[in-house]
Structures are given as structure tokens and as C-alpha cells.
UniProtKB/Swiss-Prot annotation:
It comes from Saccharolobus islandicus (strain L.S.2.15 / Lassen #1). Residues 136-155 bind DNA. This is Putative HTH-type transcriptional regulatory protein LS215_1371. Keywords: DNA-binding, Transcription, Transcription regulation. HAMAP family: HTH_type_cro_C1. Residues 125-180 form the HTH cro/C1-type domain. InterPro entries: Arc_TR_HTH, Cro/C1-type_HTH, Lambda_DNA-bd_dom_sf. The keyword Transcription applies. One of its GO terms (molecular function) is DNA binding. The keyword Glycoprotein does not apply. Pfam families: HTH_3.
Length: 310
């Protein structure tokens, strides 16, 4: 984590009087979440001078998509007015771009491998086209694109080039232009199913995933943060599961940081304990704990809790 960029991010948040929480696990290795921003539209933040890894992006995507929020990667590699879309609900911005996001300014340019595009509000496009009496063919001809392209624009399946955006503004006005981050999140359907292809019989986490999936629960596996799994039942109740590791002090730190993540994501934290010493300490601290040889109790807790959470 870059101290210079992290200080910029914190200064921006404190200037706007946002409340936030630092996630300090793992302490000395790469991690996927540095800051949890508590706001109307809560956000996960990863600060990096280096290129973020696939594992970091994967964690950010899973948490963001499962909670219908945003993950922001703040890095000096990005331009001020352009967002890079890294994955569903994961966006990379410069420190200047982050300040615009926090100030509520619209960022409408984004970059993918296919080029630079402008975010449009598909529902406004369709409404204005129908209100003004234009057919899909009329708009396609005016823009110089196919009818299929207009269908894709109106369904939200495709955004537009700068050239097409200018013509759309001429035709329908600039309120047709959207915000890359918040309009993208609102348009995403929640996805929590994941194929766990790597199964190691020696790994307790792999065995746990297998048992949870066998009992009809939806699982997302995390690698570089304090929670090990996101679990959802059929009633959409959400849990974060954290597994004790070999080091006592690191485990206590892990549980504390996982509690912050659970609070942010409005999830229930469930801790799996592997030693008797840790079991007593965690119970004294009020954590909901399960022993590693009693996973059925954890499954019964999750499957029996339908309707308890909002």
C-alpha cells in the first residue's frame, strides 16, 4: 500500500467528513481491501502504486457484486477523467478521479481493452426516443450505427464511442450521459454463484467449501482479506466465514478485521476454530464460533436462520 496515495485518499475522505475503516489484515502481505468507506453507497477501496493482481481484483469483485456496491482501486496509473473497468463493480481511478467520485461529480469516460467509451443511461435513451416519436431505425440512421446497436444501447448491454455520444447529446440532451461507477452498479444483477474447481483433500477450506455447496449454499471464496468465504442461503441471508490459522496473534487480528468487513457488508460473522484455547477466547469476546470438526452445526445455523436477517 502506497503511503503517499493512502494519505491522499484519507485527506479526501476527511475533508468531506466521510467515516471509514482501515482493514489491516493481512499485515505484511498483499491484500485486496485497504479501506471500507461507510456512506450511503458504501465502497471498498484498494490503494496501490503497483499493478493490482488478479487475486486482488477477484476478491474486490466478489465482495462488491455480492453486496451490490463498488470497489475502487486508487492508483497513479489512471488518468484524471477516465475510469478503468477491471471487473464487474471494480473500477480503477486516479487520486484526482477518486476525489471527483467522493465529491459526487459524474465520471462518464471509461477504458476497457476495447478502447474508450462513454457511459449512457439506457432507460433515459429509450424514454426520450419514444417520447419524441423516433423509431429505432430513425435513431440508428442518425447515429450511423445498426438497429441492433440501438437495441443494445437501450438494454444497457453496450455503451457508446465519443463520436456517437456527441450525436446522442445533439438529439436527446446531455442528461442521457451516465456515471460509469454508480450507474453500472445499479444496473448489475447480483451474482453469487461460483464454480470451485480447485479441490484439495488436504485443505480444510476446500473441504468446507465442498460441504457447504453440497448443502445447497452459495459460496464465494476470498484469498487476500480477513474473511475466507462469503456464504448465502436461499433466502439471501449473507455470512462471512473466517477460519483460524496457525498463528494465534494473526488469527485474533484476522477475526477483528473480519468483524469490520461483516459490519460493512451487513453480514453475520461466523468463525471456525481449530484449537481449544482459541475457542474459549473467542467465546469470551462474543464471537459466534464453530469447531472445525462440527461443521454440521455451522450448516444448521445458516440453513435454519431464514428470515432472521434483513
Amino acid at each position: 500500500m502506497s503511503k503517499k496515495i493512502i494519505n491522499e485518499v484519507i485527506d479526501i475522505l476527511e475533508d468531506k467528513k466521510y467515516t471509514y475503516t482501515m482493514i489491516e489484515y493481512p499485515e505484511h502481505n498483499r491484500k485486496s481491501v485497504d479501506i471500507v468507506l461507510n456512506s450511503k453507497e458504501p465502497t471498498l477501496i484498494r490503494v496501490s502504486e503497483d499493478k493490482v493482481t488478479k487475486e486482488e481484483i477477484s476478491d474486490l469483485k466478489k465482495i462488491a457484486v455480492s453486496t451490490l456496491t463498488a470497489s475502487l482501486v486508487v492508483t497513479n496509473e489512471e488518468e484524471e477523467d477516465i475510469v478503468s473497468v477491471k471487473a464487474d463493480n471494480v473500477f480503477a481511478v486516479s487520486p484526482e478521479g477518486f476525489k471527483k467520485v467522493i465529491n459526487g461529480e459524474k465520471i462518464f469516460l471509461y477504458r476497457t481493452r476495447g478502447g474508450i467509451f462513454i457511459k449512457i443511461r439506457n432507460y433515459i435513451l429509450k424514454h426520450k426516443r419514444e417520447e419524441m416519436g423516433y423509431s429505432i431505425g430513425d435513431v440508428a440512421k442518425f447515429l450511423g450505427v445498426s438497429r441492433k446497436a440501438i437495441y443494445d444501447y437501450e438494454k444497457g448491454d453496450s455503451d457508446v464511442s465519443l463520436e456517437v455520444a456527441e450525436k446522442l447529446i445533439d438529439l436527446f440532451g446531455d442528461d442521457i450521459i451516465g456515471d460509469v461507477i454508480w450507474d453500472s452498479i445499479k444496473g448489475k444483477k447480483e451474482v453469487i454463484k461460483e464454480d470451485i474447481t480447485e479441490f484439495s483433500p488436504e485443505s480444510f477450506k476446500s473441504k468446507l467449501i465442498y460441504k457447504l455447496k453440497e448443502n445447497g449454499l452459495n459460496i464465494l471464496s476470498l484469498k487476500l482479506t480477513a474473511a475466507d468465504l462469503i456464504v448465502k442461503d436461499n433466502e439471501n441471508n449473507r455470512y462471512l466465514v473466517t477460519i483460524e490459522n496457525k498463528d494465534y496473534n494473526k488469527s485474533m487480528k484476522k477475526f477483528y478485521e473480519a468483524k469490520k468487513l461483516a459490519s460493512y457488508t451487513k453480514s453475520e460473522l461466523l468463525i471456525i476454530i481449530r484449537t481449544s484455547k482459541m475457542l474459549k477466547e473467542c467465546e469470551d469476546l462474543g464471537y459466534k464460533t464453530y469447531e472445525e470438526n462440527d461443521i454440521h452445526s455451522l450448516i444448521d445455523e445458516i440453513k435454519g436462520s431464514n428470515g432472521r436477517q434483513s
